[in-house]
């Protein structure tokens, strides 16, 4: 383990009263990254730098990460965003105004006479993923709050999960249907595919898995 990672882990452990942090690295890697991901010390160090900068607790998934091209995309959960907003010295409350089409968040600062106001639109933000289908207004409210907080307090280098997923998708290879011109993003999880193959008990199940994983690629 690198000196930087040891130092950052110890600092995090002290912040949350968890001893010296000597046995926490493997737990952190399992908590902060998708199961089965091979996490490097450099990736873990990068995440802990951000966690320490914003005072976020990775053990409760206030912050976690998506691996990306050897680096990471730091993802802050809703509880994490709530923490860094409410802990800001100049935070003086927020308001929301919402209808079926949009949500406007207004954040007030103690040191400014004019509040910061941001509007997010359902037509621009809604996706086909589960939360956006089951709780679209709640998701839009979260989006408006986070974008407003960025402008009000200058938070940078961190993302919410929806943004992180869009970043990963943008970097993923694309498949184009020559007949229709339709573009499909290929999200192929190599580690998950290998795990599925290794779990096969016979040639028949292997053929089934191989066919299913091949269709994804």
Predicted feature residues:
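Polyanion-binding surfaces on beta-sheet-dominated domains and ring/shell assemblies
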Residues: 1-192
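Amphipathic, non-membrane alpha-helical rod segments
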Residues: 203-217
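Charged/polar low-complexity intrinsically disordered segments, enriched in acidic residues
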Residues: 185-206
């Amino acid at each position: 383990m690198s000196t930087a990672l040891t130092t950052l882990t110890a600092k995090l452990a002290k912040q949350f009263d968890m001893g010296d942090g000597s046995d926490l690295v493997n737990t952190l890697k399992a908590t902060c990254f998708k199961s089965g991901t091979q996490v490097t010390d450099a990736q873990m160090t990068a995440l802990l730098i951000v966690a320490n900068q914003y005072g976020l607790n990775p053990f409760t998934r206030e912050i976690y990460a998506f691996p990306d091209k050897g680096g990471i995309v730091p993802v802050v959960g809703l509880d994490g965003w709530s923490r860094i907003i409410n802990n800001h010295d100049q935070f003086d409350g927020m308001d929301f105004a919402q209808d079926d089409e949009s949500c406007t968040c207004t954040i007030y600062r103690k040191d400014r006479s004019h509040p910061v106001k941001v509007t997010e639109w359902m037509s621009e933000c809604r996706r086909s993923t589960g939360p956006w289908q089951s709780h679209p207004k709640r998701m839009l409210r979260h989006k408006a709050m986070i974008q407003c907080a960025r402008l009000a307090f200058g938070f940078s280098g961190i993302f919410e999960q929806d943004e992180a997923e869009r970043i990963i998708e943008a970097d993923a290879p694309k498949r184009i249907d020559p007949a229709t011109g339709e573009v499909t993003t290929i999200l192929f999880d190599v580690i998950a595919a290998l795990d599925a193959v290794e779990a096969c008990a016979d040639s028949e199940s292997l053929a089934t898995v191989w066919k299913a994983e091949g269709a994804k690629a």
